[in-house]
């Protein structure tokens, strides 16, 4: 059923909030990892199929593959964030509008039932009864084990899971197939310290990266060099089996070497990077698969400078990033970066598909907005920078639409993706995430501007380390805050945006969505 034209809608706070939630839900539904996996199943193997993977969408991806191949010899292990093992799909509370999601991302909004042959396991790797239940409601024998570990700072469970994954791909033959299911969050979940480093060293590195203000590209360039499993090392361990990597992208530009720090993508792979002018509009509209056979089969395309070209020294790049942000890394990590390492060999029989990505979800939200009578404008899927600065800039664009009808007239919605950063100073931080911090800065910049509402949230359902996906703001946000005795500037200064929005009851709480295509921001002007 098509929504009524906006001209017949009375825009009030409740309506605007409902519409923003509908747009967020459309974006998340489009990134349904199970549906995406089913659309990109590789050729069946002659021998065994070993499934490995890491990320916030790993459980749903594994369940979909397992259910699709009941007659194939499937086994394996994947790792996801604590509490995400049962997140087989997004349960949108807002009603779906007009089937816009299906047209925008070539996916349906139907949610798959969890496969009965994927079992949730404790951190020790022992299947837990009644994990992901079969359709009949009882747990079935496990073929793919789902482990849980910590995010964003790894724990001992991350190390155990990584060892299990490496063990799973040992001793295979060219007749066997390894399917690597990679999604956002994998950099922490897939943790195996490089020789000479300990878990404590890796934890210290992660904290330094998270507090530095570095972009996700820069952080993962460093992580790749300090790991015994990332940076193509998982692919190298899987030889001589055939390898297929299915990726749900959560990084600006969809660079497969950066997503989860590229466990199956070596520095010398020369993978085609799906960014900027190197990716056509038609690729964006169809999901932009990056389908590759041998690493040398396609033309080399430019990566973002920070990620480096294939000819650059990745260790030197990592050292430069550490120096640029003044990171204090453990001596063992610095020693690894200073010691020349043998190059990781690219896998000779590797196919890679990016099966869901931020731009696909933004287009799904834009389609839903049009069905609601709004004019959408996608500002981009790769917005980066300090969360406070991003919020201020986005507020300026929203104000221009409200006051001058530029760059487009109201009623309209401005959509964007990417990943903001939050630089934590020596004074420490309160409770917050990059999306709530961006929104708080936006609210301050907008002031009491009439007719502007906004939502910013992480599509995985968790903004930072808190239990909310993000939050919403409205024209009366600052007025309500001051009436409650809250000083919004102090909350922003203390990086305590979660507490600010919690006090106003403006947090967006979804629970784990089972997918992750980075941040989603929508500014509604009516």
Task: Briefly describe each language-model feature range.
Residues 2-48, 52, 85, 258, ...:
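N-terminal amphipathic/basic leader segments beginning at the initiator methionine
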Residues 2-50, 59-71, 77, 131, ...:
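N-terminal glycine-/serine-/threonine-rich phosphate-binding loop
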Residues 4-7, 83-141, 271-312:
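Intrinsically disordered, low-complexity terminal tails and inter-domain linkers enriched
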Residues 82-87, 136-174, 222-223:
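Glycine-rich oxoanion-binding loops at beta->alpha junctions
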Residues 197-215, 268-271, 299, 304-324, ...:
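Gly/Ser/Thr-rich active-site loops/lids in small-molecule metabolic enzymes
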Residues 210, 216-274, 288-317:
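A glycine/threonine-rich phosphate-anchoring loop and its flanking beta-alpha core
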Residues 241, 266-274, 296-393:
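Accessory alpha-helical/coil subdomains and C-terminal extensions
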Residues 437-526:
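Internal helix-turn-beta structural module
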């Amino acid at each position: 059923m098509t929504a009524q034209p906006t001209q017949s809608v009375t825009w009030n706070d409740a309506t605007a909030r409902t519409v923003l939630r509908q747009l967020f839900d459309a974006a998340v539904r489009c990134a349904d990892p199970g549906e995406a996996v089913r659309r990109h199943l590789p050729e069946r193997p002659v021998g065994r199929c070993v499934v490995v993977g890491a990320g916030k969408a790993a459980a749903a991806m594994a369940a979909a593959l397992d259910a699709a191949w009941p007659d194939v010899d499937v086994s394996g292990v994947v790792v996801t964030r604590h509490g995400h093992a049962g997140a087989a799909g997004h349960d949108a509370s807002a009603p779906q509008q007009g089937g816009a999601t299906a047209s925008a991302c070539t996916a349906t909004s139907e949610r798959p039932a969890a496969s009965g042959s994927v079992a949730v396991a404790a951190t020790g790797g022992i299947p837990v009864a009644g994990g992901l239940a079969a359709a009949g409601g009882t747990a079935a024998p496990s073929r793919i084990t789902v482990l849980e570990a910590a995010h964003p700072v790894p724990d001992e469970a991350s190390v155990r899971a990584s060892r299990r994954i490496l063990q799973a791909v040992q001793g295979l033959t060219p007749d066997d197939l390894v399917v690597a299911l990679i999604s956002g969050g994998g950099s922490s979940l897939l943790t195996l310290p490089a020789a000479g480093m300990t878990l404590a060293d890796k934890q210290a590195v992660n904290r330094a990266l998270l507090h530095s203000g570095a972009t996700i590209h820069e952080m993962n360039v460093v992580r790749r060099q300090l790991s015994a499993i990332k940076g193509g090392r998982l692919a190298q361990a899987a030889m001589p089996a055939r390898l297929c990597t299915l990726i749900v992208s959560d990084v600006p530009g969809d660079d497969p070497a950066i997503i989860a720090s590229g466990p199956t993508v070596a520095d010398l792979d020369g993978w085609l990077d799906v960014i900027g002018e190197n990716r056509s509009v038609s690729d964006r509209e169809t999901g932009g698969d990056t389908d590759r056979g041998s690493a040398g089969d396609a033309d080399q395309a430019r990566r973002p400078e920070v990620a480096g070209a294939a000819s650059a020294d990745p260790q030197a790049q990592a050292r430069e990033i550490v120096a640029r942000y003044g990171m204090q890394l453990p001596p063992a990590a610095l020693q690894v970066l200073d010691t020349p390492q043998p190059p990781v060999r690219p896998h000779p029989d590797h196919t890679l598909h990016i099966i869901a990505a931020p731009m696909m979800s933004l287009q799904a939200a834009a389609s839903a907005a049009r069905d609601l009578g709004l004019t959408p404008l996608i500002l981009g899927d790769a917005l980066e920078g300090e969360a406070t600065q991003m919020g201020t800039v986005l507020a300026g664009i929203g104000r221009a639409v409200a006051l001058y009808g530029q760059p487009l007239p109201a009623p309209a919605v401005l959509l964007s993706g990417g990943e903001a950063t939050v630089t934590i100073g020596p004074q420490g931080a309160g409770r917050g995430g990059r999306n709530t911090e961006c929104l708080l800065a936006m609210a301050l910049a907008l002031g009491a501007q009439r007719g502007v509402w906004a939502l910013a949230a992480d599509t995985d359902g968790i903004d930072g380390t808190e239990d909310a996906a993000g939050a919403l703001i409205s024209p009366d946000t600052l007025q309500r805050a001051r009436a409650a005795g809250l000083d919004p500037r102090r909350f922003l200064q203390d990086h305590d945006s979660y507490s600010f929005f919690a006090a106003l009851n403006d947090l967006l709480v979804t629970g784990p969505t089972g997918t992750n295509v980075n941040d989603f921001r929508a500014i509604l002007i009516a």
